[in-house]
């Protein structure tokens, strides 16, 4: 089994303009590399734009639109109307991931830490959905666990961030 750590720094405007457009911008730090990703809604699932960048993320860092990769800048400026220097790093989510094979598929346990919160998520990456569902239900029964459909990491992060922001005002 493999254990690794990655840190996602989430970027938005103070009034959550990207979130308003059901989109998310992050810089992921993994293996001493900085990868910027913009996720936007598609007809099915999400469109992802990924670029290696030189921006070293830190809390509250203001990111000029000029420092964004062209594709990302075009979308957030032209489609979302984000003004220059209104983007900043709002916080970090650190994930410790343990991966192991289980009955021929990949079982992933994530421990996520953000703000004052720690949560856990079990993911099962499968080739065949129906067979995977049966294997997962069998494992959950064996471990006496219940299945709950969680918000994804980005949604959990921003829900907590908004709660904290509302408590300040």
Predicted regions and their residues:
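Phosphate-end processing signature that detects enzymes handling 5′-triphosphorylated RNA
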Residues: 1-169
